[in-house]
């Protein structure tokens, strides 16, 4: 086999072809494109890594056995074979292939692919701890983008586990154990939302340093003034200078620490917003989309609580259906404890073409297509008044985290109204007053709605 590398480490999709120059239908990527920035899943297809297979290893031929002689195996072949096995539902055999690939001195790209797909196998089998260990190695040693983990539907069940929450927190804090790429992305978004924070922190640090230097020269003068004698500086004046310097240092350091605290809080909120944007929904046409794909199109209203409470709120909302639809409201009911296994988790890597079509964010540049008038019109036509959650456990975890951050007891009945740009507009205990919401939210064709996008 020949491997054609490209500048981008995370943009690579294995493809099999019957010869070196003719391609056939694309298979599931080793890794989804991981270099997309947060809150923007737009992808650049200018550079890829392609894996070419000779005619002896074409799709029609049977995959090599894991017990084949080592001389005939390469890490690349094992990864491709593992993907084929996963497509056929043989997760255990696929796991063996990825482990074999790691034992064959793989290059960094093959190592990244093997560890990532091995983690997906563990996640499929419910082995959260092993999945975290593989992902941590890929993040730390092989430059895996954390956005890849957030975007991959094969890891939907894993993202609902407490192990993922721990991994996400580690990635947010950064460090040698997990790498800093996710934290760097968060900092970039934080700077966009608070563009002058970096400038303020610089001046706080500079003023504190200046006061410290001044204090360094003031201390000897203060000692000399206290001792007195000929030529000693005025004690009152020197004490005043020292007090000003100390006060300046305290104030500047306090402001610097306050800005750091606000930045950390903002990055936590950005992390939650990013997690929310990747939660899947099933529209009335049975099409599965991520919440981020509905931006600028609807205002999701999440209703979380006991089944009776949510059902009653949905019935009341139906009385204001026309007004709410004019305002782009999409109801998303989440019933506590209703954990159904979604289809996309069962299918794993080998999702059928029908499933792949229903989730256009996998393996195709959805955002670019969605910008076209035709695609947007089609999506709007599929959106009705209500959507069904996919991976309810993942939705519950996000809502409970949001409740904790807002000081609400986890498990209480709550509602969360999102803006057109995907951020939280407001939230509250209990269920919303639909008449009030109809007055509060502007119609979709209103100027205020255009400014909200």
Swiss-Prot record:
Membrane topology: Multi-pass membrane protein
Subcellular location: Plastid, Chloroplast thylakoid membrane
GO cellular component: chloroplast; chloroplast thylakoid membrane; extracellular region
GO BP terms, alphabetized: photosystem II oxygen evolving complex assembly
Chloroplast recorded as keyword: yes
Keywords: Chloroplast, Membrane, Plastid, Repeat, Thylakoid, TPR repeat, Transit peptide, Transmembrane, Transmembrane helix
Signal peptide limits: none
Deletion consequences: Pale-green phenotype and greatly reduced growth. Disturbed thylakoid membrane systems.
Keyword Metal-binding: no
TPR repeat residue numbers: 75-108, 112-145
Regions that span the bilayer: 202-222, 238-258
Transit peptide boundaries: 1-92
Domain of life: Eukaryota
Pfam families named in the record: DUF3493 (PF11998)
Function: Chaperone required for efficient photosystem II (PSII) assembly. Binds to psbA during de novo biogenesis of PSII.
Subunit structure: Interacts with psbA, but not with psbD, petB, ALB3, LPA2 or LPA3. Is not a component of the PSII complex.
Additional comment: Accumulates even in dark-grown seedlings.
The protein, known as: Protein LOW PSII ACCUMULATION 1, chloroplastic
Organism: Arabidopsis thaliana
């Amino acid at each position: 086999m020949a491997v054609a590398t490209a500048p981008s480490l995370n943009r690579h999709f294995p493809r099999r072809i019957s010869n070196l120059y003719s391609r056939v239908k694309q298979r599931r990527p080793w890794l989804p494109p991981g270099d997309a920035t947060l809150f923007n899943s737009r992808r650049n297809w200018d550079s890829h890594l392609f894996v070419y297979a000779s005619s002896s290893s074409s799709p029609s031929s049977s995959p090599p056995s894991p017990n084949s002689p080592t001389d005939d195996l390469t890490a690349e072949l094992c990864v491709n074979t593992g993907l084929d096995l996963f497509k056929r539902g043989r997760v255990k055999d696929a796991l063996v292939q990825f482990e074999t690939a790691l034992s064959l001195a793989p290059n960094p790209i093959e190592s990244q692919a093997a560890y990532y797909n091995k983690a997906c196998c563990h996640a499929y089998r419910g082995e959260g701890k092993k999945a975290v260990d593989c992902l941590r190695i890929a993040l730390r040693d092989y430059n895996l983008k954390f956005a890849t983990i957030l975007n991959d539907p094969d890891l939907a069940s894993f993202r609902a586990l407490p192990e993922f929450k721990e991994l996400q927190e580690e990635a947010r804090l950064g460090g040698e154990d997990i790498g800093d790429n996710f934290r760097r992305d968060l900092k970039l978004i934080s700077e966009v939302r608070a563009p002058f924070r970096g400038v303020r922190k610089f001046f706080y640090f500079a003023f504190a340093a200046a006061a410290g230097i001044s204090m360094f020269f003031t201390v000897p003068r203060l000692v000399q003034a206290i001792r007195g004698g000929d030529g000693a500086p005025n004690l009152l004046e020197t004490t005043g200078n020292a007090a000003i310097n100390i006060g300046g240092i305290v104030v500047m350091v306090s402001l610097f620490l306050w800005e750091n605290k606000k930045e950390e809080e903002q990055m936590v909120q950005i992390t939650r917003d990013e997690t929310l944007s990747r939660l899947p929904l099933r529209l009335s046409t049975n099409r599965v989309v991520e919440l981020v794909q509905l931006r600028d199109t609807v205002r999701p209203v999440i209703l979380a609580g006991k089944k009776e409470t949510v059902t009653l709120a949905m019935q009341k909302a139906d009385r204001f259906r026309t007004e709410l639809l004019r305002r782009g409201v999409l109801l998303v009911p989440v019933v506590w404890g209703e954990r159904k296994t979604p289809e996309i988790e069962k299918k794993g890597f080998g999702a059928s073409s029908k499933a792949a079509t229903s989730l256009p964010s996998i393996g195709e540049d959805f955002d670019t297509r969605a910008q076209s008038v035709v695609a947007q019109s089609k999506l709007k036509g599929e959106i009705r008044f209500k959507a069904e959650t996919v991976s309810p456990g993942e939705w519950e975890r996000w809502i409970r985290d949001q409740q904790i951050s807002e000081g609400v007891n986890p498990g209480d009945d709550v509602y969360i109204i999102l803006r057109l740009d995907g951020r939280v507009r407001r939230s509250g205990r209990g269920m919303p007053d639909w008449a009030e919401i109809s007055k509060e939210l502007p119609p979709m064709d209103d100027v205020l709605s255009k400014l909200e996008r």
